[in-house]
Amino acid sequence: MRIAGLILLIMTTVCWTAPAAAGQSRLTSIANAGCIFAPIGDEPGDEKDQLKTCPGLGGAQVLVNALGTRLRIGFRWPKGPSPRKIVWVTEAWSAGTAVDWRGVNNSKGFEPYAAIIRMKFQKEDTPATGDQVLAVIRVGRGITCVMGAVDVGANRNANRLAHAFADARSSFNCGRDKPTVGGVTTAAARKIAKGIVEQ
């Protein structure tokens, strides 16, 4: 019996696999502090078309481009194979001030696989904020795309839902997998889930 028990213990030890590390959050700012501003163009009115480059995680920079009544978000990896390439992923009227990165800790430190950014739409015929949607964005070195969206007003605990959505799709393949809406589907969420097709 002791031998059988010892064999069972050895088999259990050999066959047991540690569960995957749970997703964690890290926050970075896309507010003015820590970001670099650069005007685009020299024509009258171009001061409204401004590029803001902010530090991110995983070797990424987060770029915020104000285009009059539109604002778009993009990513760039300055130490990647295409250091000057910007991949624009989502746009709306405005955006929140932080990027919520989802990832895991490994021997190299924190490795993000997703970024969550609050995108804001303008309330019709007013200068106020209307619908707000969390854009869930796949991020990897040189690769990024919208993989889903969660409407803040239509879902309770929208942040928690967006975290679970990002963690469940951490291996999302840009260009092959289709983005979806998490939780309650709304027109605003569908719009964000489409991402930006043209670069």
PLM-predicted stretches and their roles:
Residues 62-64, 73, 97, 112, ...:
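Polar/charged alpha-helical tracts
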Residues 88-156:
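Short helix/strand-capping turn motifs
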Residues 15-19, 73, 181-184, 188-189:
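A sequence-level detector of short, solvent-exposed, charge-rich linear segments
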Residues 151-199:
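C-terminal partner/receptor-binding element of secreted or periplasmic proteins
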